[in-house]
């Protein structure tokens, strides 16, 4: 698949999963979020990734949220399904369940907690890719998984036909260059770090899977639209205004701050998260509110 494939480029939202005060998924609110991002010009949505609280939803809930997101989108925006797990068999089960869901592809995280070797990581993703025809996007986020997938392993996996790209969330932009060199120019690289996302585009990334996008969707869509055509002056102007927000949305564990911010802006009805995640600490809330004001969102 070409690196210019519009399904996997530009401003991609790591979508929150809205919940009510009882911890149940709020599908009415989810539908409104999908509409909001379509109207704002977002290029794609990731349903039930890390920001969507995949770890505290059952497989059945994961699949239902993804299917409803596809239903609400009505073909107007590509939906990428979070389908990772730290057990290869579970990731395969999830991927198979999504076969006829209408998703554009799957985002699959490096196995967390059990810390596989590079060979184990390779075999994990190879087994998942072999169970489906859906395009697969690898997801490397060692700060959360405890394992770092090396560029050399990515290059091996890039030889598998339906492994088409990676969400690289180390925040080390030199990785973008290294992966492009080893995996080839047609292998899609998406930044997973808002603070360095624009720099990643300058170094050859095709887009960004963004947390900030949840609450600054139009600004983010505009910024990456400018960046991808080389108008970095306009892109930098937007990015400077959002930089405090990029950082403060991680002042506590994601998605705690972004859910509170989305609630503060009226995008969702509740900032509720499922345990063990709890809502944003009261003493931290003014800092995030200040970041929203600096960004021009309040």
Swiss-Prot record:
List, alphabetically, the GO terms of the cellular component aspect.
Answer: cytosol
Looking at the UniProt record, the site noted as Part of a proton relay during catalysis sits at: 50, 113
Q: Which GO terms describe its biological process?
A: diaminopimelate biosynthetic process; lysine biosynthetic process via diaminopimelate
Per the UniProt entry, the Enzyme Commission number(s) are 4.3.3.7
Q: Where is the catalytic site?
A: 139, 167
Q: Keywords on this record?
A: Amino-acid biosynthesis, Cytoplasm, Diaminopimelate biosynthesis, Lyase, Lysine biosynthesis, Schiff base
List the catalytic activities from the record.
L-aspartate 4-semialdehyde + pyruvate = (2S,4S)-4-hydroxy-2,3,4,5-tetrahydrodipicolinate + H2O + H(+)
State the HAMAP family in the record: DapA
PANTHER family (UniProt xref):
4-HYDROXY-2-OXOGLUTARATE ALDOLASE, MITOCHONDRIAL, DIHYDRODIPICOLINATE SYNTHASE
Quaternary data: Homotetramer; dimer of dimers.
The family annotation for this protein states:
Belongs to the DapA family.
Name of protein: 4-hydroxy-tetrahydrodipicolinate synthase
Origin species: Haemophilus influenzae (strain PittEE)
Q: Which gene encodes it?
A: dapA
């Amino acid at each position: 698949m070409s690196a210019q494939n519009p399904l996997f480029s530009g401003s991609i939202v790591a979508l929150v999963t809205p919940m009510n005060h009882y911890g149940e998924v709020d599908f009415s609110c989810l539908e409104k979020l999908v509409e909001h991002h379509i109207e704002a010009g977002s290029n794609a949505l990731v349903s039930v990734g890390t920001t969507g609280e995949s770890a505290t939803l059952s497989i059945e809930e994961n699949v239902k949220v993804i299917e409803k997101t596809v239903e609400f989108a009505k073909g107007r925006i590509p939906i990428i399904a979070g389908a990772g797990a730290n057990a290869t068999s579970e990731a395969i089960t999830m991927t198979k369940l999504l076969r006829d869901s209408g998703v554009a592809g799957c985002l699959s995280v490096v196995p967390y907690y059990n810390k596989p070797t590079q060979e184990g990581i390779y075999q994990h993703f190879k087994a998942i890719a072999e169970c489906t025809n859906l395009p697969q996007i690898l997801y490397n986020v060692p700060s959360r998984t405890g394992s770092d997938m090396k560029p050399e392993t990515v290059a091996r996996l890039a030889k598998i036909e339906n492994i088409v790209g990676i969400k690289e969330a180390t925040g080390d932009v030199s990785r973008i260059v290294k992966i492009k060199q080893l995996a080839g120019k047609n292998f899609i690289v998406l930044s997973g770090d808002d603070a360095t996302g624009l720099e990643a585009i300058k170094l050859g990334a095709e887009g960004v899977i963004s947390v900030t996008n949840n609450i600054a969707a139009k600004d983010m869509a505009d910024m990456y639209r400018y960046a991808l055509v080389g108008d970095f002056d306009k892109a930098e102007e937007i990015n400077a205004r959002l930089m405090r927000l990029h950082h403060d949305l991680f002042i506590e564990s994601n998605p705690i701050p972004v859910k509170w911010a989305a609630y503060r802006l009226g995008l969702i009805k509740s900032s509720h998260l499922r345990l063990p995640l709890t809502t944003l600490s009261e003493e931290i809330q003014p800092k995030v509110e200040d970041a929203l004001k600096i960004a021009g969102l309040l």
